[in-house]
Amino acid sequence: MTKIKLLILAVVMAVSSMPIFSAVVQGQELATTPLAKPKVIFFDVNETLLDLNNVSKSIATALDGREDLVPYWFTTMLHYSLVANVTGQYNSFVEIGIASLEMIAKQKNIALTSQQARTAVLTPFRDLAPHKDVVKGLKQLRALGYTLITLTNSSDAGIAAQLKNANLAQYFDGSLTVQNLATFKPDLKVYHWAQQQMNIAPQDAMLIAAHA
């Protein structure tokens, strides 16, 4: 499903007063409850709002043009973020990405300095363009009066730079990051914490996320 379809789905689900699905068990239709309009819509940022192609190109370049290693780097970064959740040894998402890149370069006998790895990860992550349908979708949601909040594994400084460089800051009412919580999504405590920060019940929230 494309990003804009997900955004439109959020609008349709939120404003509709009709059930969006029904279930049939042993020939009997089950009662459904209409979805309530959310008070807050949380947005994942990387991939959902921002195009990661520049990151992929930068990582491939750092790994001697090995585009086939980019998915390995990304899954390695995600793996160690989950390990950090379990062990309680938090490092920023970017730092994990840098360490993962250095590790893969060493595994594949690719010459890469620590500074080169840092530049390859940090520079493109801070300067990502939004997907072409994102601004239109955000404008539609703003026009409908929704409170829009980013919820990201990035640091406070990271999300501030990303939204500024992508010209998206104007569409959001605030940003929440895992920096102070020191726990990465998709740990359930992140979503509970975000709900508490906005002082809303779970049924009053909606999360928009699209991961390839």
Regions found by a protein language model. Name each.
Residues 115-127, 134-163, 174-178:
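Substrate-recognition element of Asp-dependent hydrolases with the DxDx(T/V) motif
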Residues 56, 70, 74, 94-102, ...:
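An amphipathic alpha-helix signature
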Residues 96, 129, 133, 154-155, ...:
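Short beta->alpha linker loops
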Residues 30-78:
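Active-site neighborhood of HAD-like aspartate-dependent phosphohydrolases
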Residues 81-119:
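A metal-dependent, Asp-based hydrolase signature
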Residues 149, 156-206:
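Substrate-recognition "cap/lid" segment bordering the active-site pocket of phosphatases
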Residues 2-11, 18-43:
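Non-catalytic pre-domain segments flanking phosphatase-related domains
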